[in-house]
Amino acid sequence: MASTTFALDVAEKALLEHGFFALDDSLVGDRIWEMEERGFPYFTEYGLDFCRQFAFDQRIRSILENSFEKCSLGHWLRYEEFPGHVECFRRGGPRAGRRVLVVHLWAKGSQVAYYVGSHLHEMATSRSRRSLYEIPLSELDRVGSKPKHKDFPDGGIVILDARLGFEIKEGYAITFLYATDEVIANWAKIVLPYSKALVEKVSDMEKESTRIGLNFAFEVSPGGKAT
């Protein structure tokens, strides 16, 4: 218990000061490779098992519950390399506050640069081609934010403040976003095809934590209205 508490203290300090924290995990690279080999079947029984394993990882859950009174998983996509472009999921610096946290699950061989402390500054941004916010290097220079380069030959996990700037130089990250209730209320739901098996999977996932919800909905039938 003491080591877990210490690790949580270290993670919280890193998130506050640097904007990100890397978790050691020797399994994630192989699990992502399996996911890729299957064609990234997110909304299947296999996909939800993958989601449950990592989205509710005990270490991630501890950080989320330490950061938020309540939050929900509201975004689950894969982001590929985009060298030469620094992006963030949320802008606004201190004015926006920490209301969204991101988990990057890095595939083997991925390389990324995280811009240390950039979450603490309000900067001019523009919309990137994949609907994130792009931060000009001139703005990062203005606030004195320098890149911390991370290589993941075997894959890896990083949890970060959604306001933090990052550049995916090589590879890709399967990405989870968790947001507070007031933020998630404005997000579209993740719509899953209806099946009894998937409903049961989601129900089991919802039992993992009373403080981390799922912004999921099911189609009534193929092409039907989500509920």
Per-segment meaning from a language model:
Residues 178-215:
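Double-stranded beta-helix
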Residues 214-227:
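Contiguous surface segments at macromolecular interaction interfaces
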Residues 4-19, 24-156, 162-193:
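Non-heme Fe(II) oxygenase catalytic core, chiefly the N-lobe of the double-stranded beta-helix
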Residues 1-6, 224-227:
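Eukaryotic N-terminal low-complexity, Ser/Thr- and Lys/Arg-rich leader segments
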